[in-house]
């Protein structure tokens, strides 16, 4: 829940319009630059979401989801602690904002599937 609140804080402090950000990336995916290993690690962790959902559904094991959500939140914390999101320039800023936004949405969706309420701020 803390990671979701942190993402909301980034978006609010940065005055980010999520719809414009998503549209920009959809229209021009080349703006994403995964140049840092922490960016790549977070992106790869996010890409596992579909497989995690399939595992949970196949085996009826919600603990798979809770474990993966913990891993995602930990991965995001490492990313956030080491890399500036709002102070980054150009494509780096866009990439980091997109990764942050997607992390927040994915954590929220995973927790809601488990019946966990997710606050926007702590």
Summary of predicted features, one role per range:
Residues 1-122:
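Non-catalytic interaction-recognition regions
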């Amino acid at each position: 829940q803390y990671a979701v609140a942190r993402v909301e804080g980034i978006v609010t402090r940065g005055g980010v319009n999520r719809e414009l950000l998503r549209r920009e990336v959809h229209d021009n995916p080349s703006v994403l630059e995964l140049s840092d290993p922490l960016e790549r690690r977070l992106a790869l962790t996010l890409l596992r979401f579909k497989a995690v959902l399939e595992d949970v559904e196949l085996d009826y094991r919600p603990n798979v989801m809770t474990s993966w959500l913990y891993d995602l939140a930990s991965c995001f914390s490492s990313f956030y602690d080491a890399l500036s999101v709002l102070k980054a320039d150009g494509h780096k800023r866009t990439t980091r904002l997109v990764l942050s936004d997607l992390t927040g949405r994915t954590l929220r969706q995973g927790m809601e599937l488990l019946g966990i309420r997710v606050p926007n701020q702590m």
